[in-house]
């Protein structure tokens, strides 16, 4: 069992990937959406960077934004986008460009990670845009 907690996702994925490359059967379990701001993109990126032949299978559940929209009675249809305000793995200036692009294109936007203990201003910046 590899338990790294928050902010150590890359280290956990690297450890799991190394075990898989040694021929072990590995299962990475994490909360959240597997392919949307989850662990799957990290693992696929490692596979690509290493030129690995490790077989990957992702078993996603329903996305949080879909469930939230359903509970609110506001299903998301047609074109839309999903933006995370977390700058742990993506620089804020890149996130801000994406917010501007989504607003310019008039997309319905689902927002992930609107606040955290150490980051309060991004939510307000998003609202201003």
For each feature predicted by the language model, list its residue ranges:
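Non-catalytic terminal and connector segments of soluble metabolic enzymes
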Residues: 10, 14, 19, 99-105, ...
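A contiguous loop/helix-start segment that scaffolds small-molecule binding in enzyme catalytic cores
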Residues: 24-26, 104-129
